Regions:
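Mg2+-dependent endonuclease catalytic cores in nucleic-acid-processing enzymes, primarily RNase H-like
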Residues: 1-123, 157, 167-185
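Extracellular low-complexity, Gly/Ser/Thr-rich intrinsically disordered linkers
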Residues: 106-159
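Short, Lys/Arg-enriched, Gly/Pro-containing loop segments at transmembrane-helix junctions
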Residues: 161-165
Length: 185
């Protein structure tokens, strides 16, 4: 649940804590990650953090002491808009149901309420998203992006967007560890 709107942040946190569905609800915070700021891939991972494709659930500590997700809004808005640009039926397409455009007019207006400016800094290029002054409502865009982040958190991914996992050494039994220790002495 979007917890970035200042007036409702505490309400969202309280709802996520007190809901009968608290085990599966997370407040979310989109963060502007521009070309000159540190990308999510370079954040230092702390014990207890859950990290995914341009999102992370930090270990809980501090004032609100509740699990929450933080994600790179620029990356996820670009990802979501790219899905809308894929031809119907092709892999990676995001399609809207029905065949009556008038039924989706408000959704379309809000999903296009922002535009990006491609910027460069620190050796990387990033689409930085800005609000259109004539279209102040972007609630459906925020919801759509939040759904994409949520899907990623649940394991959904497109070919080529998966993060290479850290190579894990095979698990050893206690007996094997003892044998290995004796060999090394």
């Amino acid at each position: 649940i979007d917890a970035n709107w200042g007036h409702s942040t505490n309400v969202v946190y309280q709802f996520c804590r007190q809901s009968p569905h608290s085990a599966i609800l997370l407040p979310s915070h989109g963060r502007f990650v521009g070309a000159s700021t540190i990308p999510f891939s370079e954040y230092k991972r702390r014990p207890g953090d859950r990290v995914g494709l341009n999102w992370r659930v930090p270990s809980i500590r501090g004032k609100r002491a509740i699990r929450h997700v933080i994600y790179d809004t620029n990356w996820w808005k670009s990802f979501t808009h790219a899905r809308l640009g894929v031809a119907m039926g092709d892999r990676g397409c995001l399609s809207i149901f029905g065949d009556r455009p008038d039924a989706h007019r408000m959704f379309a207006e809000q999903v296009t309420a922002e535009y990006f400016i491609r910027t460069e800094g620190r050796g990387r290029t990033v689409d930085e998203w800005k609000a259109r002054p004539e279209q102040p409502d972007n609630h459906w865009l925020d919801c759509l992006v939040g759904c994409a982040v949520g899907a990623s958190m649940q394991g959904a991914l497109l070919f080529g967007t998966d993060i290479p996992s850290a190579r894990q050494s095979p698990r050893l039994s206690f007996n094997e560890l003892q044998k290995q220790k004796r060999r090394d002495q």
